[in-house]
């Protein structure tokens, strides 16, 4: 078994394979095929939703990257998603004192996973924008998971559970991985505004887009 493992490491060293499909892509995180598939998931800019910017449809490679980030805390997945998010933020020409924060995870889930994937994504965006990260949001209670809930149920689930710790008097960019109904983002944005944020802009890596029938 050790010999087989040695041969595998020699012939297929770690770090040379695509993080989504394992195809060889020396020096890059995504192979050409997965990168093209990810680019095809990009959402057009919606001028009517200036306070919420979602980069990719929550499908295909984009969805796979979010799952890697959320369920496996994969920093490489955060790096890939953060690139387009940072490009979008830099294009906004925000004030110099703008700070980044993230949608906080319930303590019980954070302790179970050992890491907060939202913070990982936020810090990856920070490294590309130069904007500082502040932990502003905290959960006052541990709600149930939001997965599978509609907007009304999500709002009820997190009602009064998110608050802003301390005060803030600048523009805040709220980072999240998936926008589903917008309920969680709305509650977080309201908490930030109550704490004094002059403007809150949510930037999410992906968005669930319902198919039109």
Identify the role of each PLM range:
Residues 1-176, 180-213:
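Glycine-rich phosphate/pyrophosphate-handling loop used in enzymes and phosphotransfer proteins
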């Amino acid at each position: 078994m050790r010999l087989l493992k040695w041969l595998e490491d020699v012939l297929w060293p770690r770090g040379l394979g695509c993080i989504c499909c394992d195809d060889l892509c020396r020096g890059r995180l995504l192979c050409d095929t997965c990168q093209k598939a990810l680019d095809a998931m990009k959402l057009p800019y919606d001028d009517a939703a200036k306070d919420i910017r979602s980069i990719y449809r929550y499908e295909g490679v984009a969805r796979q990257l979010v799952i890697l980030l959320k369920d496996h805390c994969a920093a490489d997945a955060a790096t890939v998603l953060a690139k387009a998010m940072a490009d979008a933020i830099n294009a906004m020409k925000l004030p110099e004192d703008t700070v980044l924060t993230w949608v906080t995870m319930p303590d019980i889930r954070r302790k179970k996973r050992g890491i907060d994937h939202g913070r990982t994504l936020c810090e990856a965006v920070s490294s590309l924008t130069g904007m500082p990260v502040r932990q502003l949001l905290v959960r006052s209670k541990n709600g149930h998971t939001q997965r599978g809930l509609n907007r009304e149920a999500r709002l009820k689930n997190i009602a009064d559970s998110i608050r802003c710790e301390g005060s803030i008097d600048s523009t805040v960019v709220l980072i999240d991985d998936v926008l589903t109904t917008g309920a969680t983002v709305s509650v977080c944005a309201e908490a930030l505004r109550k704490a004094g944020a002059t403007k809150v802009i949510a930037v999410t890596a992906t968005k669930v887009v319902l198919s039109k029938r």
